[in-house]
């Protein structure tokens, strides 16, 4: 079954507001996770390359050793930089890593890009992992992820996937503090980076060529502008690029000319640069 209730898409971090006094120390977090993992079976951590799943994989590798595996799924929707980050950490810290094909591009329901596309993405991910192992699957979802529309969590529940950070009510801020305390310097401050398909407006078919174009433009703007937040959106009206305020101020002249030329070279209409708006490619169905 797939979720039908519409809602606002959670594309990026929406952090639970907690006072400094309410945040647990990294030592307390590691202790709580160690206690949870004492009774855990062998585990397969679904690792996307973001701060949450990378931190969870590091904790599991430290606590469980050979009983923990990291599973990373590749597809046109996964930025190559995320895959390289996972591979590098596995080499550096001795993680047991298996890289698999996500398979969602073979799913017509996913390719149709409905409002609950994430359900079909996670359904394919967890089913592919299950083809390789019978271990308990862990995801890096954190407590902040429960406050919005997350159809991927429905697919996880249907497949008995566990979320240790959710079980221990660990917030995004606590995950980042935990990553810092463990020396995961490349990931501790990573901005939210949803899959590339999130850049495509609901109802527009997901195409690998579109996602490769999105990744190219975003990578170039990060390098050229030092942009902390950049989203290349493909919509019915054309391509618009959303930037953080500082980057937006420097996006004219040669920067705009380059992006416009790349759009024209691939037969795309460039709409322009606009301020970043979370989840703006998501079109929610009307609710009676």
Regions found by a protein language model. Give the residues of each.
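ATP-dependent adenylation/nucleotidyltransferase module used to activate substrates
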Residues: 3-181, 239, 258-269, 277-288
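Short, aliphatic-rich beta-strand segments
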Residues: 69, 234-245
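Alpha-helix N-cap and loop-to-helix initiation/capping positions
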Residues: 113, 117, 206-209, 250-254
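Mid-to-C-terminal catalytic subdomains of enzymes
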Residues: 166-172, 176-231, 275
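Auxiliary Fe-S-binding modules of radical SAM enzymes
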Residues: 215, 222-224, 230-233, 245-288
């Amino acid at each position: 079954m797939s979720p039908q209730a519409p809602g606002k898409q959670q594309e990026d971090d929406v952090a639970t507001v907690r006072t400094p006094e309410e945040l647990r120390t990294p030592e307390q977090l590691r202790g709580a996770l160690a206690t949870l993992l004492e009774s855990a079976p062998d585990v397969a951590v679904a690792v996307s390359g973001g701060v949450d799943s990378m931190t969870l994989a590091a904790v599991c590798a430290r606590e469980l050793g050979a009983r923990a595996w990291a599973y990373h799924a590749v597809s046109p929707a996964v930025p190559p930089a995320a895959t390289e980050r996972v591979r590098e950490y596995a080499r550096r810290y001795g993680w047991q890593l298996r890289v698999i094909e996500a398979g969602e591009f073979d799913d017509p329901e996913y390719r149709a890009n409905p409002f609950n596309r994430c359900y079909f993405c996670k359904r394919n991910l967890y089913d592919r992992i299950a083809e390789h192992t019978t271990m308990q699957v862990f995801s890096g979802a954190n407590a902040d992820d429960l406050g919005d529309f997350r159809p991927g969590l429905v697919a996880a529940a249907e497949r008995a996937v566990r979320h240790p950070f959710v079980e221990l009510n660990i917030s995004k801020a606590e995950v980042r503090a935990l990553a810092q305390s463990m020396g995961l310097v490349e990931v501790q401050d990573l901005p939210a980076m949803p899959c590339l398909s999130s850049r495509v407006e609901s109802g527009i078919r997901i195409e690998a060529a579109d996602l490769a174009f999105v990744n190219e433009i975003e990578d170039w703007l990060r390098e050229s502008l030092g942009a902390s937040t950049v989203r290349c959106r493909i919509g019915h009206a054309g391509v618009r690029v959303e930037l953080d305020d500082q980057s937006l101020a420097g996006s004219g002249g040669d920067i705009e000319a380059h992006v416009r030329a790349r759009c024209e070279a691939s037969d795309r209409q460039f709409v322009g640069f606009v301020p970043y708006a979370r989840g703006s490619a998501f079109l929610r169905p009307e609710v009676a």
